[in-house]
Design a protein with these regions (language model features):
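Bacterial N-terminal signal peptides that target proteins for export
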Residues: 1-10
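C-terminal segment of classical bacterial N-terminal signal peptides
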Residues: 15-23
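Exposed boundary/loop context
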Residues: 4, 18, 77-80
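Small-residue-enriched, tightly packed secondary-structure blocks
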Residues: 26-192
Length: 192
C-alpha cells in the first residue's frame, strides 16, 4: 500500500513538472511575440472558444445574437496549495466591431494540485454592462453559475445582472464558471 502511494505521488510530481515546464515554455513563446501577433492569437482563441460554446448549445448562440457584446479570456491556473493564474482576452461590441484587449488574474489559497487551462466567455446584455466591464474592469467575488453539464450538453443559462458567463475546458462546458477571485482589466500594451 505504501509503495503504491509512493508511486502515485512520484507519478503526480513528474506530471506536474512536465506540465509546468510546457506552460513556462508557452509563456516564454508568448512574451517573444509582437503586439499584432498577440492580438491575432487572442482573436483566434476567442473565435475558437465561441465556436466551441455554440456546438450543440442553441441557447448560448441565441443569447450571443441578443447580446450587445462579448468577451473571451484564455486562462492558465496553477495550484500547489496556493493557486494563481492569468491570461489574456478580448472584449468586442457586436454592432460596431470595436475590440478592447484585456487581461485577467487570479490568486487564492486552498487544497489543490495541478494545472487548469480554460476559457471564460462573457455575453453582455446591454451597452452599460459591457462598457462598465471594459472601462472599469470587473472582479468576480463568487463562483458564477454558468452552464449545465458535460461536453455538448445544452446550457441553461440566461442573462443575470446583465451578463451570461460560460467556462470551457478541454472536457467541454462546465457546470459552473469558477471565476471567484478573478479580476479583469484593460491590457494597456495591446490597446496602444
Amino acid at each position: 500500500m505504501k509503495k503504491k502511494l509512493t508511486l502515485v505521488a512520484a507519478g503526480t510530481a513528474i506530471a506536474l513538472v512536465v506540465s509546468t515546464a510546457s506552460s513556462l515554455a508557452a509563456e516564454e513563446s508568448w512574451k517573444s511575440l509582437k503586439r499584432e501577433s498577440k492580438r491575432m492569437k487572442i482573436d483566434e482563441t476567442a473565435q475558437d472558444a465561441l465556436n466551441a460554446l455554440f456546438v450543440g448549445n442553441p441557447k448560448a448562440e441565441q443569447l450571443f445574437e441578443m447580446s450587445y457584446g462579448w468577451a473571451v479570456f484564455d486562462n492558465l491556473k496553477l495550484a500547489f496549495g496556493f493557486s494563481g493564474g492569468g491570461g489574456n482576452g478580448v472584449a468586442k461590441a457586436r454592432e460596431s466591431g470595436e475590440k478592447t484587449y484585456m487581461q485577467m488574474g487570479t490568486a487564492g489559497i486552498g487544497i489543490g494540485l495541478g494545472i487548469n487551462k480554460y476559457q471564460v466567455v462573457f455575453l453582455f446584455q446591454d451597452s452599460r454592462t459591457f462598457e462598465n466591464f471594459v472601462e472599469k474592469g470587473w472582479q468576480a467575488e463568487a463562483t458564477a453559475s454558468a452552464v449545465a453539464g458535460e461536453a455538448g450538453a445544452e446550457a441553461k443559462t440566461d442573462f443575470s445582472n446583465g451578463m451570461a458567463i460560460y467556462q470551457i475546458t478541454d472536457k467541454g462546458l462546465m457546470a459552473f464558471a469558477d471565476i471567484a477571485g478573478t479580476k479583469y482589466w484593460k491590457n494597456k500594451k495591446l490597446n496602444k
